[in-house]
Amino acid sequence: MNSNRAAAGPVEENVGTQASVGPCGFVYLYPGDTFPVEEASLLGNLHAGGEVFSLPLLSGLTVEADFHVNVKAVHKKLDPATVSVKASAYHREVIVFANAACFKPIFAGPGLEGLCAASRQLFGYAEFEERAGGAARPFELADLGHLLPGAESHIAGVVVTESFKERLYRGQLVVVESQIQSVRVGECDAFKVPLYDGELFAKSPCRENLRYFYHAGVSRYLFEAHYTSLAQALRVRDVPGLIGALERQSFHDQYKLPKVYECREFPATGHRGAGDCSLTIVDSVATELAVSYGLSFLEVPQEGTALLSYDKWPIFEGCETPEQRVEALTQFNAKQAVHVHSQLFSGNSVLYLARVQKQASNRGGGGENVYNSFFMGHGLACLAEPTQKENGLPSFPGVPASALSGSNYSLHHLAYAASFSPQMLARHCYYLQFAQHQKSSNNSGYNVPTYVGTAANTPMCELCRGSCPASCVNTLFYRLRDRFPPVVASVRRDPYVVTGVAGAYNDLDIAGNFANYRDKDEESNQSEEREKFTYWQVTQTVLERLSEAGICEGGEDVGDAIHNIGSFLKVFKEIDGIVDGEVARFINSMVKNNVNYRESIKSIHHIVQYVCNVYWQPPCPVFLNLYYRCVLAVVQDICLPTCMMYEQENPAVGVSPGEWLKMHYQTLWTNFKNSCIDKGVLTGTEYKVVHKDQFCDFFDVDSAARGEFVSCKTQVRISRALMMAPRVMKIKNRIIFSNSPGTESIQNAFVRGTPKGDSCVVSGPYMRFLSTYHSQLFPGAKISPLFLWHTFSKKRQLPVFPNVPRESVTELANYVEQNSRLHGETSIIDVVPENFYTYAKVRLNNALFRACGQTQFYATTIHCLTPKIQTVPAEEYPHALGARGVADVGEYLGAARELTVPTVQCTSRDNICEVGKCRPIVTLPLVVNKYTGVTGNSQIFQCANLGYFIGRGVDKNLIPDAGSFKKQGVSTSMRKRHVFMTPLSDHLLRRSVQGAAVAFEIEGVRRRVQQILSDGDNPHVIRDVVLQLVKSLGSECRSVSEYDLEYYMGQYYIFAGDVSERLQRLSDLGGDWSEEWALSVLGEEEDPLGGELEFEKVEDAECLGHPQQDEFALAPQAAAPQYSGSSSVAGKKRKANVILGDLDL
């Protein structure tokens, strides 16, 4: 499939081609009196005392409804009639630079600027330097006074394309005031002024009249919040040098040239041998390829999404007042905060990736795959180590040990995670306020009210000087410090945690992508003779049949399904019958389609699709930076084996990385292009951006420089036509334990142990239901369900219930014990069913695994951790008091006693399949494994596998359990994978309900009728069809025509006459058209067996008649004489006997 797509060439019909010619950015002006500042404040990252911050790019909040997210940005004039354009997407942020005081800070704690500046200097990262005064006066809002009176009072923000952020940073974009236009943004009338690159006016004689947009606050924000984060991902401390390299790449199309090697630093322990030299080269090439490919991935045109429509967010439905809208935004911010928590509290966060490392060689030989020898290493301890330039000269002396708290996480590390930006740090702290603290057992002196009333309100605090101890970041850090990871340098190849948004299609059921036939269908366009019965169809059919039986409704239990012991047994026996029947049909379908299911089951996976579209990311600057970091980390991880193999063929001993790159980088760039996309992890498409119109509308440049607008026609030339656009990143989780060499150490976590006989019921699949329906099963019972069934398991004794028949109790106990014991002996799914549908799925998948021969090892299961809001008293959450002062502990407790705060915690009880369909925000650990293809294929492929979180403070659900009724003593965390999920559907997205997805009632009737007809062993099949029609249609059966029966019965329409005859008989008799009435009428007539018919085998019965000889006339020369007498034969002779008549064989 990939080769066919590559042979077809780049796609010309794409979002880049469809983009219109336009400017490089806009300056937006919003009226301060009608702009929703309270709502916008909850979406921004303004810190206390800040003057510049960002808001997300959202139509209805910051841009107009018809804003186009892609543009062919004009940046140069090639000749008087031709302009050069660059196709690009707009940056997801609107940087507000005027009248920021109208907004409320997202975090009230002061001193963030000083903390970030001190941390930046401590870790050796370059500081922002404001541009010296240029020749031209920079643009100011007052310059628009003749066009827009009172422009200085407007809230102003700047929007820029991804390809021209560096030009905005350097103040090289020109404000074309003559093209100001009015737009409707939400409920306010705003204005926007286009920004064009200064190179467009390079030959204009009126250049002195131009107003270049340069705002030191905007440039500082880009430097700290965006470029420093990129520098951390690329292991570069020289941020200005990196910005210059990115400008050369984007503006001058230097994608195939090395650019960043002059800015790079390396550990001071390097350059001592061939191994260290190889590591330095691989590290350098990984950075260069990440800049050339990773950053180009981030600037290509992308498809717009429904997430950008702020005025259509479902969370605002039912909100009648501004306060309710603010509360709705707060609730959603709390839910997405768990993803920021997991990144900050995980020791293997993508924010803490510090260097490229090489695994030590295995002494025993035959170690790990050589392609995985280089890996992305994490560990905050690496930040404190000294570094040097490629020529060996010292660059960074390291962090003094006295400046940090040993191996303890500090505020400086939190500032590093926020890229030393006070705006980003404020947003991080806002999310941390929703986190619940976990007190360490070694921290006996931990007491939040005492800390606020004694230590935090003194001038010793360097940030707030005791003026606002409740909202100070030191107080927040004290409350949560036990959850932060230790500061250590890892030497293992551990996964790293990524955050983004999942795609619409994920294989997250228990058996994952088993029997989906997707790959086979993509490779072959041949139509199948038989309809394939996929695994998804099986689970869907089971759910539908449970719904028809009145047991489930959309995966949720029906409340009145169980009301006594009889109904309890009926429900579970009905579930067992439905599941066992569907499993048998599914297995038979695979046999008919020649599916080798016993082998294919060994390679099934859960699959999560990470969407590589920036407009699918949550509208928050923290998540935007996390998306950039994740893409760059994965691109570097993918390229490591390519760099390693090329360096081995072209060793760099005695040559500096810069000189080596100048000789080999273009070859590496070309090689990586073929090994980056569609090799297992990243899927993407190569765009060819074209402009189909020969001329387009533009304006006269010289007139614009004079402040006039004169329309003209111009030709367009694309500066960079070919673009590689990533689509999704596939993360897989292997379900069946491989038991391959090298996995012996983790085998104990997967091998199935023998369950103890005295705990099979308590740890079995029915205990959840026995506890939930305890009062219905045993009315008036005072004994707890746990004690009742634990006593029964150990002593086989049951109490006497006066209101319950003894026979019913005995039947229930025998059923539960027998099936619990059978489940414990055969189940390889370590999941406790939460509802009837989960019970059915566990039983179904256990049957499938058993049919495929998988009984020895537990299957790996995947669970989602979804956020739940909990309102708690504010006594231990001091930020509820805001920026007010506190004199002592008593005053603090008195002020906090009447307050409550929303907090967030996670639950693992939600159905991951249903959550996965809701476009969730996902946070998960992954490790990229590399391997080669079949013998003779030298291509390197990759696979992103689901990993594990490092750190006990990530979430309490991830702490290894030590339950009383564990099936075995080893940890189950190795076979249980977890993913943090926050659904966007019903929050920021409306559920897409297509017309074809909503079934008509007649479709359900047709399906149920044909299920009955497909059962060839049912002697009452016609009667059951009539009963089903009466049950579904009622009195409408009187008007059922032959055409209706043709639809309902499908291929079984040949029996429609029998069904029509019985319906007519019922119609003639008349009645209430209930199922009981129809059964009473038809039950007496339908008794075909009657105990009188006897069946015998065909070969044992005497053949009473044969075809006439002329029906099988033989050629005259081949005719043979006939003899009397017949002979009974079997097998192949039977056919010949029928054809040749009485011929004696």
From Swiss-Prot:
Q: Where in the cell is it found?
A: Host nucleus
GO molecular function per UniProt = single-stranded DNA binding
Q: Which Gene3D superfamilies match?
A: Viral ssDNA binding protein, head domain (1.20.190.40)
Give a short account of what the protein does. Plays several crucial roles in viral infection. Participates in the opening of the viral DNA origin to initiate replication by interacting with the origin-binding protein. May disrupt loops, hairpins and other secondary structures present on ssDNA to reduce and eliminate pausing of viral DNA polymerase at specific sites during elongation. Promotes viral DNA recombination by performing strand-transfer, characterized by the ability to transfer a DNA strand from a linear duplex to a complementary single-stranded DNA circle. Can also catalyze the renaturation of complementary single strands.
Disulphide bonds in the chain: none
Q: What is this protein called?
A: Major DNA-binding protein
Q: Which GO terms describe its biological process?
A: DNA replication
Q: Which InterPro entries match?
A: DBP_sf (IPR035989), Viral_ssDBP_head (IPR043031), Viral_ssDNA-bd (IPR000635)
In terms of domain of life, where is this protein from?
Viruses
Organism of derivation: Equine herpesvirus 2 (strain 86/87) (EHV-2)
Q: Does the keyword DNA-binding apply?
A: yes
Q: What is the lineage of its organism?
A: Viruses, Duplodnaviria, Heunggongvirae, Peploviricota, Herviviricetes
Q: How the protein assembles, per its UniProt entry?
A: Homooligomers. Forms double-helical filaments necessary for the formation of replication compartments within the host nucleus. Interacts with the origin-binding protein. Interacts with the helicase primase complex; this interaction stimulates primer synthesis activity of the helicase-primase complex. Interacts with the DNA polymerase. Interacts with the alkaline exonuclease; this interaction increases its nuclease processivity.
Query: What protein family is recorded?
Result: Belongs to the herpesviridae major DNA-binding protein family.
Its cellular-component GO annotations read: host cell nucleus
Chain spans, region Required for nuclear localization = 1115-1145
Keywords linked to the UniProt accession:
DNA replication, DNA-binding, Host nucleus
